């Protein structure tokens, strides 16, 4: 508990340091068009939070990006399991996964703009950009499963279901957590980028684009802070779900 409090305090002081530095630099520049001050950004965020379309934009973007992320999780697990059990599938998927990891995000967004409606653009881009990370992490976790545990399960004739739950899932959860957190950051970056380029009505990307057109730097910073907060909440929810799975497996 004391260690957690110290960590929280250190992180809090670090955040305060950067906010103060931001305020000092903004004060020195003294041009809101170039760099908005933290106080101006906070005021804009509070004002925006009481507007109806603010929450509509938040829910629209959050739902689409997180939907894409969880679709990527499901698809990545299925493909990783297939690759683990069938070498031919692993060989077949290798060039595809390697290619996806190398393709620039902007190229992916433009390609999907040609293929699909802008409303679903952030979902598809999030899936496409995060799938390789999830797939590689889960596959590595499966390949690192302790062979001695599998032999022991075979000797004691442990059922396939128990083997999956208590050996495979428990072993791959740490890989799923680390890969998932990395993928989540990519999902938000690529998803918002897709919205800025595609400009779907009622999205965060739309208001970011408008802020750029009208040179509204305060609003731009305000929405950037909102995106950071949404990403932070997403990470906490994901980690909680992983820990919940661990507790269920351990019977706590």
Kindly give the residue locations of the regions a language model identified:
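Periplasmic/extracellular loop-to-transmembrane helix junction in inner-membrane transport proteins
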Residues: 28-70
């Amino acid at each position: 508990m004391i260690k957690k409090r110290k960590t929280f305090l250190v992180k809090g002081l670090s955040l305060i340091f950067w906010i103060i530095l931001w305020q000092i630099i903004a004060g020195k520049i003294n041009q809101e068009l170039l760099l908005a001050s933290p106080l101006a950004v906070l005021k804009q965020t509070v004002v925006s939070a009481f507007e109806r379309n603010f929450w509509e934009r938040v829910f629209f973007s959050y739902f689409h990006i997180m939907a894409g992320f969880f679709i990527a999780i499901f698809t990545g697990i299925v493909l990783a399991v297939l690759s683990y059990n069938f070498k031919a599938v692993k060989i077949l998927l290798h060039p595809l996964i390697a290619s996806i990891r190398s393709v620039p995000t902007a190229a992916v967004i433009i390609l999907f703009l040609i293929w699909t409606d802008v409303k679903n653009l952030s979902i598809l881009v999030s899936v496409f950009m995060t799938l390789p990370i999830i797939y590689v992490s889960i596959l590595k976790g499966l390949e690192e499963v302790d062979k001695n545990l599998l032999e022991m399960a075979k000797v004691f004739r442990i059922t396939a279901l128990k083997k999956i739950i208590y050996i495979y899932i428990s072993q791959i959860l740490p890989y799923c957590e680390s890969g998932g957190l990395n993928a989540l950051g990519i999902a938000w970056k690529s998803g918002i980028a897709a919205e800025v380029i595609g400009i779907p009505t009622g999205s965060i990307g739309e208001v970011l684009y408008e802020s750029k057109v009208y040179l509204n730097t305060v609003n731009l910073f305000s929405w950037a802070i909102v995106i950071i907060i949404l990403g932070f909440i997403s990470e906490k929810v994901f980690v909680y779900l992983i820990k919940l799975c661990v507790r269920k497996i351990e019977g706590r």
